[in-house]
Design a protein with these regions (language model features):
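ABC family nucleotide-binding domain
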Residues: 2-3, 8-25, 29-210, 214-217
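C-terminal segments of enzyme domains that contribute to small-molecule binding surfaces
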Residues: 223
Length: 223
């Protein structure tokens, strides 16, 4: 397994009240597979995803990626690994409003520290935009895009640096059923063809057919 968590716990304290959100979660992700996390609101599924992605720190437990304990690394080294090897897609596309589709992806390559030349970066961006069906919109700004188009660009941005892990938190929440299926078909195709390990949180049961594994969170644990 390329990615795993071991006994992840997370508590939040408000005043004198402490609430344990995650109660010792063991999770594994495999390349070329979509793992879907489901559960009721407040079950801890989004908290688990953000901790796995390094966007939150656990109260205790270990996160292993590609044979390394991320918690044992320096913060700088852990950030570098996340920038190079992790991709993120969220409910909202979070596109930069004043950048074109092409520029969104070029910025991602720069952020990830891509070793490619400027020419190679543009070629890679063009290839990925074509892959997600948005090559004809490379000069478009977010304001002129539909919700489905924005999410396709967000997915392209998340994979342009060839990450090994993709974290997707409710990636279809803002889309209608038709666009949701299109986005899931795209995620499924990219997960397989690029051999990415994808972890997805969703509340839409009809989309679970696109997942290779479905895990249920209940009361801070994997049921």
């Amino acid at each position: 397994m390329i990615f795993s968590t071991s006994n992840i716990k997370k508590s939040f304290t408000t005043g004198e009240v402490s609430e344990e959100i995650l109660k010792g979660v063991d999770l594994t992700l495999a390349e070329g597979e979509i793992t879907a996390l489901v559960g009721s609101s407040g079950s801890g599924k989004s908290t688990l995803l953000t901790i796995a992605a390094g966007l939150q720190t656990p109260s205790s437990g270990e996160i292993h990626f590609d044979g390394q304990d991320l918690g044992a690394l320096s913060p700088e080294k852990a950030r570098q690994i996340r920038a190079e090897s992790f991709g993120f897609v969220f409910q909202s596309s979070h596109l930069v409003p004043f950048l074109t589709a092409e520029e969104q992806l070029l910025l991602m390559l720069e952020t990830a520290g891509s070793p490619l030349s400027t020419k190679q970066q543009r070629q890679e961006v063009e290839k990925i935009l074509d892959e997600v069906g948005m090559g004809h919109r490379k000069s478009a700004y977010p304001a002129s895009m539909s919700g489905g188009e924005k999410q396709r660009i967000a997915i392209a941005r998340a994979i342009v640096h060839q990450p090994k892990i993709l974290f997707a938190d409710e990636p279809t929440a803002s889309l209608d059923s038709t666009k949701s299926r299109e986005v899931m078909e795209l995620l499924q195709k990219l997960t397989k063809t690029l051999n990415i390990a994808t972890l997805m949180v969703t509340h839409e049961e009809d989309l679970l057919t696109y997942a290779d594994r479905v895990l249920t969170m209940k009361d801070g644990r994997l049921a």
